[in-house]
Amino acid sequence: MAKKTIQYPPIEQYSDIVAEPQYDLFYNNGNNERDEEGTLRVLSLFSGCGGMDLGLEGGFICHRHSVTNDDWIERQLNDNWTLLKRNRFRTIFACDILEEARNSWLDYMSRFRVNPDIYHLESIVDLVKMQEKGLDVFPHHVDVVTGGFPCQDFSVAGKRKGFDSGVSHKGEKRDDNLPSEETRGKLYVWMKQVIDIVQPKMFIAENVKGLVSLGDVKEIIQKDFSSAHGNDYIVLDPQVLHAGNYGVPETRERVIFIGIKRSALKADALHALEQNKVPSEYNPYPKPTHDFNVHDQSLSRPVTCKDVLGDLPEPEDSHDLSQKTYSKAKYMGNGTQGQTEINYWGLGPTIRSEHHGNIEYRRLSLLKFRI
C-alpha cells in the first residue's frame, strides 16, 4: 500500500513568514494581536533569553514526538515539526543584567510584537530599590511571577558556596567576605520581595538539582518564599523534574518551586493544597508525558537527539553559519572538554555556557545551541 502523502499548507498564503534556516522550515505565527480578554499577565525575573517566558506563551515550533496532545498543535509544518498554539500567558515585564540575553530575548519575542521597553537591563536588587524609593517600576495586576534565580552557587559543577556567594548581584566578584543579602546566592530573597510588591496569584521559581543536596538550602528557600506577603502563599514541596520525561532530548534536571496565593483560591482548592499529600487533580506539577526514567510503558517514548538533529545536513554541507561554526580544537583524549560526542540515539547532555556539559562533554559553539 502506497504511503499517504500529507499536503501541508503552502507558505505563500501566509503574510508574516518566519524562517528556521537550520531545518528549512517556514511558518507564520498567525494572528499575533493580543487578546486582552482572559489573558494571564506574567512578570519575568532573571529572564535570560526567554526560555521560561516562551514556554508559558507558546506559539513556537517543536518536534512532533514531543507533543502528546493534538489540541496543543496550531499547525503541522512537515512530517517532523509542528507549530504550537499560543497560550493565555503574556509577558509584560522581563529583566536581566546581561545585554546579550536581552538581545536574544528581543530577537525572538519580537515575532510576537512585544514592546522592547518591557525588558529591563537591570539587576533585580536595583529594581526593587528603585521601587522602594517611590518609582513605579513593576507593573500592576500581575497574575504570575516567574524566575530562574542564579544557579551557579548551588550547582554541583561549581564551588557550591550557596548563600555565601563571592559574586555580587551584578555578576561581579566581591572583594569582601562580609555577609550580604545582595550576593548572587541570595537573589531569590529579592524575587520574594518582588512577590511582596506585586502579589501575584502564583509564582514559579527554578534552579539546579544540586540545590536539593546542599544542606537545608531547599527548606530555607521554601520557608522564605512561604513568608511572602504575610504568609499568604502556599509553597508546595519543591520537585525535581527531568526534561527527558517531558519530550525534551536533554538530560537536564531542575528543581521547581511553586507558590499559590491563598486568598486567590476557592475553598476546596485551598483545603486540597494544604494537605501533606496534594490530590492529583489539584497538583500543579506536570505529570510526565514521556518515559525516560519513570518506567511507565503507557507514556510516549523519549525524544532523542536523532529526532531533533537528524534532519540537519553535515556542517560542511550547510549554508547556515550557526551550524558551520564549531570548535575544531585538537583531540586531547578522553575526559577532557569537548572530546565525547553526544549520544545520537539517546538524550543530549546539559550544555553550559562554557561549551561543555556537566557530565558529558561536547565541542560546539554557542551559536549552534540556538537551534
Residue ranges of model-derived segments:
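Core alpha/beta nucleotide-donor-binding catalytic domains of modification enzymes
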Residues: 9-199, 209-215, 219
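S-adenosyl-L-methionine-dependent DNA methyltransferase catalytic core
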Residues: 1-89, 224-228, 253-371
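Class I S-adenosyl-L-methionine
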Residues: 127-142, 152, 156-348
